[in-house]
Amino acid sequence: MTETSVISPEVTQLLEDKNLAFVATLMKDNSPQITPTWIDLVDGIIIVNTAEGRVKQRNVSRDPRVAISIVDNKNPYNMVTIRGKVIEQTTHDADKHADKMAKKYLGVDKYPFGMPGEKRILLKILPLKIFHMTPRS
């Protein structure tokens, strides 16, 4: 297992493959809240697409610290845990990004789960600590 703040090629692959990420945030009472979600990586920043007002978005507005766990869906012994903080929340291109994630995870061109009046928001996460466990050969 290695610990670093640099995203290695192996961790990049985990983030770019069709693996679900489990994103943990802190509730108002400091209890953990965890959500399985789609994930993206752009220029060293991890991006989570959510809807404005959802629990994880409210939580990171109050406390930007997050933990992310990803397990390779092809090999459960290839895994990464990332601690970081949300450095930006933006609605800019969030709908377009949801479509990009739908293409990656579902193979469809348009995000199919949007609700009427829903406002998509991107959570941009700066990785601070990365723990990667590689499978043994």
Where are these regions (language model features)?
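Charged, gly/pro-rich active-site loop segments
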Residues: 2-6, 78-137
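Short beta-strand segments
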Residues: 19-52, 66-70, 80
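Extreme N-terminal tail/first-helix region
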Residues: 1-20
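Short, surface-exposed beta-strand-loop junctions and turns on beta-sheet-rich folds
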Residues: 54-56, 75
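Solvent-exposed residues in well-ordered beta-strands and their adjoining turns
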Residues: 42, 51, 71, 87-89, ...
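A short beta-turn/loop motif at secondary-structure boundaries
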Residues: 29-31, 72-76, 115-117
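Hydrophobic alpha-helical segments typical of transmembrane helices
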Residues: 7-10, 22, 56, 97
